[in-house]
């Protein structure tokens, strides 16, 4: 298994000479939500439906770039819409894996909002009751957040798995990605966290630097998942068969 530094250096090498095209593609991808919101009435709905598909298409295009293929700035459109249904199917399956912490978080938020609303509408504010309710709601939200973190990182590479083999069912893709992440979630979390300094710089530059940081981060994460899934050594098929046999 390569170290984080080695993965990042490999990503830099793979992007060498193609950073401009990669940055331009991320720029086009980034302005799409804004353009959709300009469409009266249906814009926000269209954005919610299409954006996850374009996100998948962006990842698929960067996998192609990593493999040395020639890519176009708008390739993420065709790559995304080619697997429109599967992209949504995988996204929904991942959300369903998070149903319990999501439900707890919604209940916690509802408790806090209810306490504030009741206190404001009654006119006679009972600070002790409101405070207890707010604390209970806040604790529920915190528990839900902490609970969701390991689940999120278990299935965070489900879209990568889809990009490598879209012929399988959504549930098989999600479960397979989760099995590859067994014993690797902490490494995946630390890898993501290691980019935090870059994103501080992205904020300082009002997002402009992000057009170069996002390709760097995506390719690094692609390399990481390829290593844990055996694809770096072209052993993904054999490893997948091993996983299914163990079931």
Show where each model-derived region lies:
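Hydrophobic alpha-helical membrane segments
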Residues: 1-247
């Amino acid at each position: 298994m390569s170290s984080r530094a080695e993965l990042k250096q490999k990503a830099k090498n793979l992007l060498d000479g193609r950073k401009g095209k990669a940055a331009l593609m991320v720029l086009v991808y980034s302005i799409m939500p804004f353009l959709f919101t300009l469409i009266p009435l249906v814009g926000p709905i269209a954005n919610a439906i299409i954006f996850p598909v374009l996100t998948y298409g962006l990842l698929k295009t960067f996998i192609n770039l990593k493999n040395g293929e020639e890519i176009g700035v708008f390739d993420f459109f065709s790559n995304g819409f080619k697997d429109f249904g599967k992209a949504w199917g995988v996204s929904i399956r991942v959300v369903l894996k998070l149903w319990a912490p999501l439900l707890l978080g919604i209940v916690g938020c509802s408790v806090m909002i209810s306490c504030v609303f009741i206190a404001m509408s009654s006119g006679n504010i009972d600070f002790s009751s409101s405070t207890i309710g707010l604390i209970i709601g806040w604790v529920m939200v915190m528990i839900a957040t902490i609970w969701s973190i390991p689940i999120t990182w278990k299935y965070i590479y489900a879209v990568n798995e889809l990009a490598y083999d879209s012929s399988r069912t959504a549930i098989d893709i999600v479960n397979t990605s989760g099995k590859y992440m067994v014993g690797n979630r902490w490494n995946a979390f630390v890898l993501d966290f290691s980019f935090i300094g870059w994103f501080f710089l992205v904020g300082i530059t009002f997002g402009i630097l992000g057009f170069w940081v996002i390709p760097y981060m995506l390719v690094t994460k692609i390399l990481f998942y390829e290593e844990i899934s055996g694809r770096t050594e072209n052993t993904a098929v054999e490893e997948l068969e091993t996983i299914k046999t163990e079931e």
